[in-house]
């Protein structure tokens, strides 16, 4: 998946699917998908790429991470994955959280408060993301493995998820329509080790894998 924007500060971008054929040549798959980014655009994240010049992603900066990233679990409000989705899926309920408390050992990790423990996340973490929300943003989503080493302050809880409205920016995730996200998830083949490549078009030449 390749997400490109016009500049670092742009909150809108396009996602194009790419797939290698048997000869190793890369081909576009389908039409480009409109997506929204963080309201502050993008900054280099921590992923499979080497460091490069440009703004850096930090906790709470409202930037989506730029770079090359592995993909984690798909998730959603349903108990089981939608038909045709092959990536590992995790159903989220009111006890599921993603921790963005930089002082916690659980930083940048999905955590579940098990029953019968009181469902009081504020007693465990100073800041957290509810994975079962009152809106449809996380009705369907995909974890982006930004900052997999959980470096405090480097950014957390980065997902591909359903947007609140067309062109509505996020707090640092990449969002699109539910229909487009479902198409994307059904296309992903975990056996192919898919990745997310995300950067302003002018920064793509600077991308180098570790």
Indicate where each model-derived feature is located.
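Cell wall/extracellular polymer interaction/catalysis modules
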Residues: 1-171, 180-210
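Residues that recognize and position ribonucleotide moieties
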Residues: 174
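Conserved "landmark" site that anchors the functional core of diverse proteins
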Residues: 177
